[in-house]
Amino acid sequence: MYEDELERLEAPYPMQRIVHRRLPGDWEGPVFVWDVDKTYLETRFSQLRGLLRIPFELAIDKRPVAGVPALLHAQRRGYGDGERNPLFFISASPPQLAGPVTARMVQDGVEFDGITFKDVPSVLRRGRLGQLKEQVAFKISALLRLTEELPAGARLHLFGDDYEKDAQAYSLFAELAAGSLRGFELERRLIEVGAAKRYARAIATWAGPLPERDVVQGVWIRLVRDPSGGRIDGMPPIVRGWKTAEDAHAALRSAGVLP
């Protein structure tokens, strides 16, 4: 049923999304944005081998990362003194998996306000097979389109993993949003981390006129490939690693984001 709700966006990167909630202009507080693969679910839909099995892979059969549903519930609940905190997801899975992925969320009792999928069929139609496994341009584009619709009082907490380049994508987005990285230098940095030139240029063009907003308050990276944190060494201070959902929850409490 969720496939019928998908909105198609072509720029700055092909994506399809579902948005259930629009925040009022005077809303203030944390907004949690989660990667799906390897951060919420123990899966890798973005692998080419996995994509070839679609639609036979069902998200309902995938295990959530231990403790993550409870963490998502806590984030949604927040301090419990008003509206529930906004919760959005970004997935490199194709939009054909909207139903199964959201069914998994329902099974886990996870309330969400929106989810963005990579428009894999559109990327393939453009003859960009090599871009199926490159996620930085897609994730930054999804964050751009989400953030431009959020009120000025929103503060983003971005959750990803070190299996790919989530830390790089999120920290680049933080610089972009704050206005310290725009234009040619943004395009160059995107290409440097693997984005196709056409998408790097499209992102730089899209970001150019946007207001400067220091909107990213935290980048939270699940340490999958290197539990020692080696893959996020040297990243900006807002980037923090977590091995377990309990670790992440404790860090959010320490930062005053959660009770």
Where are these regions (language model features)?
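C-terminal cap/substrate-recognition subdomain and adjoining C-terminal extension
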Residues: 93-259
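Short acidic/His/Gly/Ser-rich catalytic and metal-binding motifs that mark active-site loops
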Residues: 40-51, 124-126
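Basic, amphipathic juxtamembrane/active-site segments
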Residues: 46-68, 177-182, 186
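Non-catalytic pre-domain segments flanking phosphatase-related domains
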Residues: 1-34
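Asp-based phosphoryl-transfer active-site loop
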Residues: 28-44, 170
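Surface-exposed cleft-lining segments at the edges of enzyme active sites
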Residues: 55-59, 87-89, 127-132
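Short, acidic loop-to-helix structural element flanking the phosphoryl-transfer center
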Residues: 57-85, 95-99
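Short coil/turn segments at beta-strand junctions that form active-site/ligand-binding loops
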Residues: 28-30, 83-85, 148-155
